[in-house]
Amino acid sequence: MKEKTKKPRYRLGQNMLWMLRQAHAAHRDDVPVFAVIKALAMSGTGISGLLLAPEIVRCVEEGAGFSRILATIAVLAGVLLVCSAVSAYLEHAPMFARVDVRLALIRKIHYKTCVMSYPLSEDPEVLKLQEQAVRATINNRCASEALWVDEQKFLTAALSFVVYLLLLTNTSVWLLAALTVTTAAEYFVNRRINEWGYRHRDEAAALEKKMDYVSDKARSTVLGKDIRIFGMRPWLEAVYDKTLRAIDAFVERRERVYFWTNVIDAVLTAVRNGLAYYFLLRQTLAGGMGAGDFLLCFSAVGAYTEQLNGILTELGTLRRQSLELCTLREFLELPEPFRMEGGKSLPECADGKYELRLENVSFRYPGAEADTLHGIDLTVHPGERLAVVGLNGAGKTTLVKLLCGFYDPTEGRVLLNGEDIREFNRQEYYTLFTAVFQKFSVLEATLEENVAQTREGIDEARVRECLEKAGLTERVAALPDDLKTHIGREVFEDGVLLSGGEMQRLMLARALYKNAPILLLDEPTAALDPIAENDIYQKYAAMTVGRTSVFISHRLASTRFCDRILLIDGGVIAEQGSHEELLARGGKYAGLFEVQSKYYREEGENDGRE
């Protein structure tokens, strides 16, 4: 099967200019200057060292006096010493300047990751591209830093090559032609191997991602109990070994390609050197040059071959690094699907109440074969408490993502006060919502910072009030440093680990602290028992009177207090109405409610017998 190729978006020259702009933006214009100076110094070192012995022989051959020989030695040795000293100094001096440029790119990657739109953050192709971008900036040997070193090596080889070419102009034109043909062949071989690596970068990234995931889960302190209780170690080891074997197979395949490339390179180099020595010796035996010229040309042929190989090698390396920089640039330049800048301002509402309407909305995830939601017509009235219920996978969370503006519908429109939300600045639109999702993130920071989501201007009294409403007052009182206690142990050794239920209560406190006009709860209490869930939902019912609220749950009893309940089934609104109205109809909602009620009654009876 023919492999699908992916043409690089940028050429080598374009990426070099881009890196120059990055160095300038990082206030490190000295990086390219260092590279040029070192290239000149290293070229001077090689050329002066090559000329030293032939010039002495030429002086002796011409019968020059001792003073001339001594002066020749002094000049060439002096140039050699100065160039060597400059080269040695510049071997390490520019390192921190190159690191500064790379760190600036790392900051850009992190910023892009933090601010890119939600659809991009869930797109597998974007996540692969992100990993490749990180790989291009991960250490001192990566493309974004090593490029400067290899540019310097290429300049060194190119400058030296020109000098040695001029020295060999007195030799046979057939010699130069032979060198050109063999080196051109070597160039195309190296180009093919670089393109092979670029074509298989996605495969390598996928294997690396899988290995990182398995390793991360195996080291997780949060999952440590589950791994031990359920005896998951052999399974994790088996998955790790399987992934490692897949990586080994890929590396073996890659190294096999590299091996045969190196074999071809070696053959071409041997042919090139053999032809060079053949033409040079034939000209010498014919009496076309003296002893000094012979020694000079003899040395120049070896240096010429070495620098020609250097040009080809560095050109291949630069091309490979350019391909890695292409992935970095592609990630940083990913277009945003939303209006994150510009766009219309939100409509002003004195009472802070907004109407949300879904107009014939359908949504299909990228790569999916069927719609998750289809033909949804829904109006969330200002101040309404709306519940969305249904079985797992019915599309409840997707509906919330559309309301929040995390996704745009595949068909139809989402309207805010009658205007399409795609016309608004999406960052401003997000300020209308405070949400708690089933999957959440807790920062490695203090408790109060996790609630307030900031380090400055924290209202401590308000933080305590929100924690109390979320039912965490007693837990906070037991913490060693009260609100200053660190959460998590990945960064802080003195951090505490909260239980799953406590984490979700913390998320509720965070939502209360933001106090946005619209509240969305996407099954945040799923880890709690039904009684605890009902208790928290009842608290929210009391706290959100007159405030637009959307509650998502698969436990129908927890949302009875809502003004209206939607039952999502198969991606459509199957039923809607109040709890009492839906029970009276005797439809799907009533059936699900009866099944769940029966389950909890039986569970309660069993607990009582125990």
PLM regions: where:
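Helix-to-loop junction immediately C-terminal to a conserved catalytic motif
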Residues: 404
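ABC-fold ATPase nucleotide-binding domain signature/coupling loops
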Residues: 130, 415, 473-506, 515, ...
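Cytosolic ends of transmembrane helices, especially the final helix of ABC transmembrane type-1 domains
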Residues: 232, 276, 295-333
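Transmembrane helix-loop-helix hairpins at lipid-water interfaces of multipass membrane proteins
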Residues: 32-89, 165-197, 271-278, 282-292, ...
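Extended non-transmembrane interhelical loops and adjacent amphipathic helices
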Residues: 1-17, 99-145, 207-250, 322-335, ...
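C-terminal portion of ABC ATPase nucleotide-binding domains
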Residues: 482, 538, 546, 555-610
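ABC ATPase nucleotide-binding domain helical subdomain, centered on the C-loop/LSGGQ "ABC signature"
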Residues: 413-415, 430, 448-493, 537-538, ...
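Membrane-integrated ABC transporters
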Residues: 1-46, 61, 66-71, 90, ...
